[in-house]
Design a protein with these regions (language model features):
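C-terminal motif of bacterial Sec signal peptides marking the signal peptidase cleavage site
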Residues: 21-24
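Bacterial signal peptide processing site
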Residues: 26-28
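A short beta-strand-turn-helix
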Residues: 45-66
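Short pre-active-site segment immediately N-terminal to redox-active cysteine/selenocysteine motifs
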Residues: 64-66, 71-74, 104
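Conserved redox-active cysteine motifs that mediate thiol-disulfide chemistry
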Residues: 70-87
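Structural microenvironment flanking redox-active thiols in thiol-disulfide oxidoreductases
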Residues: 82-119, 133-138
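Short, internal strand/loop/helix patches
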Residues: 115-148, 156
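Thiol-/selenol-based redox modules, centered on thioredoxin-like
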Residues: 148-180
Length: 180
């Protein structure tokens, strides 16, 4: 029964993503110190990735700790936990936080950017636009049903997966402390 439910959820996500037109962008980055003014403007350009372009962000041998959160504007539990993630990131600048929007690329200018501004989201946002959800969900975690919010926390030694929302800042902090 659980397998049928998981397959139904994956199929539903696949259908949703099949409706999205695939776009691409260059995946280039450089290390630099970010000023507070740049932090405010971090989401002026939101990159749109397919999974092959996105995958290097979640599989890195860096010494950093990463928090990658999959979310969407239409997901109430996702929106509820965004302030906790934002607060955590402000208090822990050594942790690389990336918010992965699963919204439609056509909504970036008209809905996503205004939403981020209204909610004072200053963490890096990327948009994942890949119709083959059945393939990429399993690559992220074979146990992930595809439901959001979904968060990956990792460093070069360990990976933790959370298919639930964080209840508050303390909940988020307690989970990331579990990394070696």
């Amino acid at each position: 029964l659980n397998t049928n439910i998981i397959n139904l959820l994956k199929s539903t996500l696949c259908i949703i993503f099949a409706l999205i037109t695939l776009t691409s962008c260059n995946n280039t980055s450089t290390e630099k110190t970010v000023t507070s003014e740049e932090k405010k403007n971090v989401n002026q350009d939101i990159p749109v990735y397919n999974f092959n372009q996105f995958e290097p962000l979640i599989y890195t041998e860096s010494d950093k700790t990463y928090l990658i959160n999959f979310w969407a504007m239409w997901c109430a539990p996702c929106v509820k936990e965004l302030p906790y993630i934002e607060q955590f990131a402000a208090q822990n600048p050594q942790v690389e936080v990336i918010l992965v929007s699963l919204d439609f690329p056509k909504d970036i200018e008209t809905k996503l950017k205004p939403f981020l501004k209204e909610k004072n989201i200053t963490q890096k946002v990327v948009l994942l636009d890949d119709a083959d959800a059945n393939a990429w969900i399993d690559k992220i975690d074979p146990n992930w049903s595809g439901a959001i919010p979904f968060t990956i926390m990792f460093n070069k030694n360990e990976r933790l997966f959370y298919e639930r929302s964080f209840e508050n800042l303390e909940d988020l902090e307690n989970q990331i402390k579990k990394l070696n």
